[in-house]
């Protein structure tokens, strides 16, 4: 990466794409910004954590779009409890759009704290300001693209360099969104024989980004 706070990801045949550009009759260039956005569902995130002192089992009610993954991640990476002693239930999720796939610290804290106070359930609901500040955001790409064409106007090559802001730390699927779910789909419905893409994923002092409404595919379609 050209940035100290980033990682570079590449896909495509750079040599073949460079050759296509070298022999092209026309080359057009464009710079695009895909703005950062906040999902802002009408129903904010909420969680209830409960620890059963008799069975030593944990139960988490949470507005998660992916309760099975939440159970796996909370068990494997947060070390709260083995999976067979942890239930994650997603009743009324409300609007999600991808932002409720990420495993948030508040959910884990509710079940962790319930054990610390003798098994009393703990409820947490985000207010609107918290949702704006802490929910996983979406998009935030700055891209430079070049398109090569032959004399008849047929596309023979595409080069793309995208700077994707990851936020202060990685969320559940953030590294997949601007790479495999974006750069591999840049051709869209067109037959482009040579494509080379570079993605600079950089850390920024902002909320982390994650999957949002198509997760990389809309960004590719826009470009």
Task: Annotate each PLM feature.
Residues 1-223:
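Structural alpha/beta core scaffold segments of enzyme domains
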């Amino acid at each position: 990466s050209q940035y100290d706070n980033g990682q570079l990801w590449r896909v495509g045949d750079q040599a073949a794409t460079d050759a296509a550009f070298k022999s092209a009759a026309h080359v057009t260039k464009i710079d695009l910004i895909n703005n950062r956005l906040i999902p802002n569902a009408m129903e904010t995130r909420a969680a209830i954590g409960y620890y059963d002192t008799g069975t030593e089992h944990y139960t988490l009610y949470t507005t998660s779009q992916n309760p099975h993954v939440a159970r796996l991640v909370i068990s494997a990476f947060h070390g709260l409890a083995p999976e067979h002693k942890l239930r994650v239930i997603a009743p009324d999720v409300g609007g999600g759009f991808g932002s409720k796939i990420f495993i948030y610290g508040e959910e884990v804290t509710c079940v962790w704290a319930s054990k610390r106070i003798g098994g009393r359930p703990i409820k947490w609901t985000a207010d609107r300001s918290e949702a704006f500040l802490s929910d996983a955001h979406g998009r935030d790409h700055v891209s430079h693209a070049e398109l090569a064409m032959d004399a008849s106007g047929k596309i023979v090559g595409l080069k793309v360099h995208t700077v994707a802001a990851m936020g202060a730390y990685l969320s559940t699927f953030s590294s997949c969104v601007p790479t495999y779910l974006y750069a591999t789909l840049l051709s869209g419905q067109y037959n482009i024989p040579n494509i080379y893409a570079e993605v600079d994923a950089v850390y920024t002092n902002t909320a982390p980004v994650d999957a949002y409404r198509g997760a990389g595919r809309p960004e590719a379609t826009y470009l």
